[in-house]
Design a protein with these regions (language model features):
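ABC ATPase nucleotide-binding domains
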Residues: 236-261
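Conserved ABC ATPase signature
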Residues: 136-140, 144
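Conserved ABC transporter NBD signature motif
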Residues: 57-65, 74
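Helix-to-loop junction immediately C-terminal to a conserved catalytic motif
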Residues: 49
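H-loop (His-switch) and adjacent beta-strand-loop-beta switch element
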Residues: 210-223
Length: 261
């Protein structure tokens, strides 16, 4: 069983955003969602996280309609990091990570304190943020701040981790750092990762499965080497590109010019 989408249609202000999507997200794999700006990538991610429930069709988790699963139960299985997150003023890294334990608490019960501490500590260690626990989030660099947000998501102990352009605004080193953390979580914990990426080469290197969205529908889905090629770049993004193999034996796409109409 897995996270699946059947005939998904989303409209906003009577405008088609997604139309007739059918998708299966392989359990324990890394799926990258790519496509041009405005294609509906972030909308799809919000639907998968039940942040947007105004749609036609069915989104199911292990065969159960997502809209019938309680928000608390869903948050224990699925965590999402949208774009543009803003931390409360003066909050520390440790306190932010502790927010990830909210799905395990209720208004009349604080939860299992020992389990919460262990989950938060593990999340900080997994992201290399254990020595930053008492630092204010707003005082961190961009890369450190993104790792702090990932730690919060990991404290939920989810089976599914959804990320919307997790490397946006980061320099090359911090992009690599974040992508390696995500891949390690997938490899060591068999965590299912679904991420919207704008960097095609990140998708080539760090995804097991690619979903390409164009004109509000699925242009292609498959393994990176099957769907990421110069023909796709021309048709979906309108650019000509070269493809070569780098020193690590990985394929790299290098855009060189716009496609001439």
């Amino acid at each position: 069983m897995a996270l699946e989408v059947s005939n998904l249609c989303v409209k906003i202000a009577h405008k088609d955003i997604l139309r007739g999507l059918n998708l299966h997200f392989p359990t324990g794999k890394r799926t990258a969602i790519i496509g041009p700006n405005g294609a509906g990538k972030s909308t799809l991610l919000r639907v998968l996280a039940a942040l947007n429930t105004k749609y036609e069709g069915v989104v199911s988790l292990d065969g159960e309609d997502l809209r019938k699963i309680s928000r608390k139960k869903l948050a224990q299985r699925l965590a999402i990091l949208p774009q543009g997150l803003s931390a409360p003023p003066d909050i520390t890294v440790g306190a932010l990570a502790d927010y990830g334990r909210f799905p395990y608490r209720s208004w009349h019960h604080s939860g299992n304190a020992k389990a919460d501490r262990e989950a938060v500590e593990m999340a900080l260690v997994q992201t290399g943020m254990q020595d930053f626990r008492d630092r204010q989030v707003m005082a961190l660099s961009g890369g450190e701040r993104q790792r702090a947000w990932i730690a919060m998501a990991l404290a939920q102990q989810p089976e599914y981790l959804l990320l919307d352009e997790p490397t946006t605004y980061l320099d090359i080193a911090h992009q690599l750092e974040v992508m390696q953390i995500i891949s390690r979580l997938n490899r060591e914990q068999q965590m299912t990762v679904i991420m919207v990426l704008h960097d095609i080469n990140h998708a080539l290197q760090y995804a097991d499965e690619i979903v390409i969205i164009k004109d509000h529908g699925i242009f292609a889905q498959g393994q990176p080497e099957e769907v990421l090629n110069v023909d796709m770049l021309a048709k979906v993004f309108g650019v000509r590109a070269d493809i070569f193999v780098n020193s690590q034996g990985a394929s790299v796409l290098s855009p060189v010019a716009l496609v001439q109409e």
